Every structure is written in structure tokens, then in C-alpha cells.
Amino acid sequence: MIDKLLRIGIAVFLEVDMEKYLSVTQVINWDHPEIIRLAKQIALGHETSTAIVKACFEWVRDEIYHSFDYQMNPVTCRASDVLKHKTGYCFAKSHLLAALLRANQIPAGFCYQRLSVDDQGSPYSLHGFNAIYLAEMGWHRVDARGNKTGINAQFTPPQERLAFSAQLAEEADFQTIFAEPLQIIVEALATQDTWDGMLCSLPDVNQTVNPSPSLLSALISPPCSRII
């Protein structure tokens, strides 16, 4: 009886904890009619949640243009705006992917790396991507940034194939899975209108600090250089 109650308690805890990775927020506004429409359209014909995840991931990766790669305006943040304008930095693309997945009742969160902007060292910037809960294996990280020469991010669970890896001493791969985007990310995107203006507002944190949604004190002066 005790074992049964313990299992029930754990199941309830996991269900409650997972709810935050399904929630509607100001940024992840998956209740927007166009996001719901697209989420249903992408899911159509796929019989498993894993197949839906793959389809959503590839759609955002390939159909939403990375703001720097294509030098496109405006700078987007909210999921519905990313969809409307079909462009966004890595952070914004992760917001739309999370929205599409949550609209399909698939838990999705946010992950971050600290990377050199030009692979040569300073300046550094955060890089944003997603973690998705797969029923058969748990959390799996994916990067819908967009592929190009030298970048080949794929959905190949259980193997993780991200766009980048932390290699330099001052780079970092933070393991926390956040239910909401970091506030410093949202603020950086909200204060810029153009893709080149955003280059001078790329958010950064100290690599020894595991960032939290309320983290502001570790914000470093943003680099003014090309995006990773």
C-alpha cells in the first residue's frame, strides 16, 4: 500500500511539475488562433507524439528564417509574432517551437549555451534552443536555429545533434530546462527593432553562473559583433 501511494504521489508531482512546460504565457502564446491552426496542420497525419515533435522542429528550423543569416526585420520575441513575420533570432525561434509543441500538448522548455560570437573568444553571447519531453525517453534537446554551412542540427533521439557545442574555456552548456524564456532574453529582444541593432544587444551571462529566469545581476555588457 505504501509503495502504491508513493507511486501515485510521484505521478501527481510529475504531472503538476510538467504543467508549467505546457502553460500559455505572454511570450509563449500558444492559444493564438494562427499558432493553434499551424500546430494542428503540422500534426495532421502523424500518429505519435515523437513524429509530431520532429515535424514541428523541422518546420521551425526550415521555415522561419534566422534574423542574422537572412538580415531580416523586425526583431521578434512573442511566438505569434515570430510566426507572423517568419523570422527570428535563435531565441525567438525557440519560443515558436515551444508554442507549437505546447499547442499539441507536448511539454517543451528552454535551454541555453554561452558561446563565443565568432569562435575566437570574447565577445560571448547566450544561445537559445529547446528541450522537449518525449514520453518514451524523457527530456531531449533540439536546436531549431536553422542550418547552414557548418551547422547541421537534427532531431535524432536519443542522440543529441545541436547546432553548437561549448568548446572554449569560457563557453558553457547550461543543463537547466526552463519553463519560460530568461527575462534578459525577452528584454533584449523587446528593446530592438532591427536585426543589426540586436547585434549590439546580445545577452550574456558569466559562464560560472547557472542562469535563472530572474537573473539580471550577471548580465554583462552586450557585444557588438556578428552573431554565432
Name each model-derived stretch.
Residues A172-V205:
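Alpha-helical and coiled-coil interaction segments, frequently adjacent to or embedded
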Residues D17-H85:
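Secondary-structure boundary elements
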Residues I52, C56, K86-L96, L101:
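Active-site nucleophilic cysteine motif
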Residues A92-L182:
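Hydrophobic/aromatic-rich core segments of domains that either
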Residues N206, A218, S225-R226:
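Intrinsic low-complexity, disordered N-terminal segments enriched in polar/charged/small residues
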